[in-house]
Amino acid sequence: MSDINSWCASVLKRVQWQEADTFECSNDLQRYWLLGLDSLSRRLEQHCNVLSVSVLDNTHVNPDKLTVEEEALLSGEVCLRRKVILKGDQQSWVYGRTLIPLSSLQDQPHDLTRQGHTPLGITVFSAQSAHRDKLQVGTIMTERGELFARRSRLWMNNKPMLVAELFLPEAPIYSKEVES
């Protein structure tokens, strides 16, 4: 699992991010997956029998390990870093990397440090005040082909976290079928 973790992390670092409102989606399928402001996990669930999570990392990181952009969107404090692979019917679909400031973990209805194999989006978007902002989208050419990615800030009970998602080659975003 560490090989895919390293590969995905290095790919995400090379993405050239664009604001969502300036990103040119080629079709409705890309728009559906990249620009949705609701739970990606819920969308993925609709395209498989079993959505599962493989946890790659769930550790604290110091602010000096964050990028300048990440620090600007968060409070410059120690964060819980969660890295996962979201799988649809055992196929790796999305690599997710979430940074949750320790202050955002306090006074929440769920203990996000013990999220385990539950998709974070399911938990976050079950909160009444959950929403997403600062959505950015990008592509990156890899040895596995061109891949899409997105990143945004999620708010749960008025507390921020950052999530970056890399759509892996088997993800439904690359399906030849058009969404209805």
UniProtKB/Swiss-Prot annotation:
It catalyses: chorismate = 4-hydroxybenzoate + pyruvate. Its EC number is 4.1.3.40. Pathway: Cofactor biosynthesis; ubiquinone biosynthesis. It is found in: Cytoplasm. GO terms for molecular function: chorismate lyase activity. GO terms for biological process: pyruvate biosynthetic process; ubiquinone biosynthetic process. The keyword Hydrolase does not apply. Belongs to the UbiC family. Substrate binds at R82, L120, E165. The lineage of its organism: Bacteria, Pseudomonadati, Pseudomonadota, Gammaproteobacteria, Vibrionales. GO terms for cellular component: cytosol. This is Probable chorismate pyruvate-lyase. Removes the pyruvyl group from chorismate, with concomitant aromatization of the ring, to provide 4-hydroxybenzoate (4HB) for the ubiquinone pathway. Keywords: Cytoplasm, Lyase, Pyruvate, Ubiquinone biosynthesis. The keyword Iron does not apply.
